[in-house]
Design a protein with these regions (language model features):
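N-terminal helicase ATP-binding lobe
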Residues: 1-246
């Protein structure tokens, strides 16, 4: 039972054989090729499409009242629209060898590093590594050698399905900053889960991607404020700021 575990210590809800939900696998720290990443993300999205089909069949087969069926099909129509958005964003923005795919993988790198340090900062494990004669700083080779079962032995740290989907849904909103992107400007994606569901990691991933995009796309003009975080409670604002600044 992980329901009482801290947010970033809950095991991700993996889909069946979904290696592409593993954060380190998606990052620049893994040996996975761009094509393998794209293929995995395609399978991830198609799993959502398959789920929608199953739900539609379930509604049709069950003895629901007409008004109940209408509500169900309306919601599934919205799901289908998001499924099409996911496919469009992947095909349009995450192209093999593109800068956008590099930004996406670097975002996963930053999330993995943040999680690793969040777990081991001040602990004996990290002190032992720093005292080791072979320690050469916190560079790419160091993080490549780190195990990714950070919070639970044997389970790779990864995105929950809704977190990865939320990031993919917003690729166009971040990577396409042309002012005439009117269709996208009409959409606002809201992620809602009870406390401990993983909302923070989902939008921290987007913030990281936004920062990387601005700096890589606009160089020195890409500095400055990239995201504004505001909460209704002052203590919550402080807590979330501490988490975001790790």
């Amino acid at each position: 039972d992980t329901s009482k575990a801290p947010l970033n210590q809950q095991a991700p809800e993996f889909l069946s054989n979904s290696k592409v939900q593993q954060i380190k696998y998606l990052s620049t720290l893994s040996a996975a090729t761009d094509q393998e990443i794209i293929d995995g993300l395609n399978k991830f999205i198609e799993a959502y499409g398959h789920w929608i089909s199953i739900k539609k069949a379930s509604v049709e087969e069950n003895d629901f009242k007409e008004n109940e069926k209408e509500v169900a099909f309306n919601e599934l129509t919205k799901c289908s629209a998001d499924y099409e958005r996911l496919k469009h964003n992947l095909e349009t923005y995450l192209i093999v060898g593109s800068d956008n795919l590099k930004k996406f993988r670097l975002m996963n790198t930053s999330m993995f590093i943040q999680m690793w340090h969040g777990k081991y900062a001040g602990k004996d494990e990290i002190k032992q590594k720093m005292d080791d004669a072979s320690f050469n700083g916190f560079n790419a080779d160091f993080y490549k050698s780190c195990n990714d079962d950070i919070f639970q032995t044997g389970i790779s740290s990864g995105w929950r399905a809704f977190q990865l989907a939320f990031i993919l849904l917003n690729l166009d909103g971040i990577l396409d900053d042309t002012p005439d992107n009117l269709n996208r400007n009409e959409l606002v994606d809201l992620v809602w889960f009870p406390t401990g569901g993983g909302k923070t990691e989902a939008y921290l991933g987007l913030i990281s991607l936004t920062i990387l995009h601005r700096r890589m796309q606009h160089k020195e003009r890409g500095g400055g404020t990239a995201a504004i975080m505001r909460y209704t409670l002052r203590l919550l604002t402080l807590q979330q700021f501490q988490r975001a600044s790790k």
